[in-house]
Amino acid sequence: SDEAVKYYTLEEIQKHNHSKSTWLILHHKVYDLTKFLEEHPGGEEVLREQAGGDATEDFEDVGHSTDARELSKTYIIGELHPDDRPK
């Protein structure tokens, strides 16, 4: 059985906007990319700019490979709380 999904509020996610803890939202899923910053092919700067917020639009605009999408899954720590999702 799958473990219960961990939900994070937007307020909580927004606190993780620095190099010691870098979280992002993509498609309502929360990613901890702290350890990925230096490995990001697009550079860490773009991730830092989006840190603590929703980067879905930028992620899709840039276009990411299937490999990138598969890799990104390993950094998922939970999901954005349903109450904080756009209606």
From Swiss-Prot:
Keyword Acetylation found: yes
Binding site for heme: H40, H64
One Pfam family here: Cyt-b5
Membrane-topology annotation of the record: Single-pass membrane protein
Keyword annotations of the record: Acetylation, Electron transport, Endoplasmic reticulum, Heme, Iron, Membrane, Metal-binding, Microsome, Transmembrane, Transport
Modified residues (N6-acetyllysine): K6, K15
GO cellular component terms, semicolon-separated: endoplasmic reticulum membrane
Entry's localization field: Endoplasmic reticulum membrane; Microsome membrane
GO molecular function: heme binding; metal ion binding
InterPro entries: Cyt_B5-like_heme/steroid-bd (IPR001199), Cyt_B5-like_heme/steroid_sf (IPR036400), Cyt_B5_heme-BS (IPR018506), Cytochrome_b5 (IPR050668)
Occurrences of domain Cytochrome b5 heme-binding (ranges): 5-81
Main location: endoplasmic reticulum
Functional summary from the UniProt entry: Cytochrome b5 is a membrane-bound hemoprotein functioning as an electron carrier for several membrane-bound oxygenases.
PANTHER family named among the record's database cross-references: CYTOCHROME B5
Family: Belongs to the cytochrome b5 family.
Name of the protein described by the UniProt record: Cytochrome b5
Gene: CYB5A
